[in-house]
Amino acid sequence: MTDKIRTLQGRVVSDKMEKSIVVAIERIVKHPIYGKFIKRTTKLHVHDENNECGIGDVVEIHECRPLSKTKSWTLVRVVEKAVL
């Protein structure tokens, strides 16, 4: 049995907390009846140890043990910095 660590990529939507960010993960799902493809967004609280992320950055995150009530993801790397 292999335990793969779940890794996702998303955009930072909030960095107002200390050592924490909120990342929006977008996915496309097909409507079960009408068949239209719809964008769905999931917001995850992520641990950012060095406060290196800003709003608009594209980041890679992976799952970890629960760090608080809402945080169970941690930052791996910043894929792309936001253009100001």
From Swiss-Prot:
Keywords: Ribonucleoprotein, Ribosomal protein, RNA-binding, rRNA-binding. InterPro entries: NA-bd_OB-fold, Ribosomal_uS17, Ribosomal_uS17_bact/chlr, Ribosomal_uS17_CS. CDD domains: Ribosomal_uS17. PROSITE patterns: RIBOSOMAL_S17. One of its GO terms (biological process) is translation. GO terms for cellular component: cytosolic small ribosomal subunit. One of its GO terms (molecular function) is structural constituent of ribosome. HAMAP family: Ribosomal_uS17_B (MF_01345_B). One of the primary rRNA binding proteins, it binds specifically to the 5'-end of 16S ribosomal RNA. PANTHER family: 40S RIBOSOMAL PROTEIN S11 FAMILY MEMBER, SMALL RIBOSOMAL SUBUNIT PROTEIN US17M. NCBIfam families: PRK05610.1 (NF004123), uS17_bact (TIGR03635). Part of the 30S ribosomal subunit. Belongs to the universal ribosomal protein uS17 family. This is Small ribosomal subunit protein uS17. The lineage of its organism: Bacteria, Pseudomonadati, Pseudomonadota, Gammaproteobacteria, Enterobacterales.
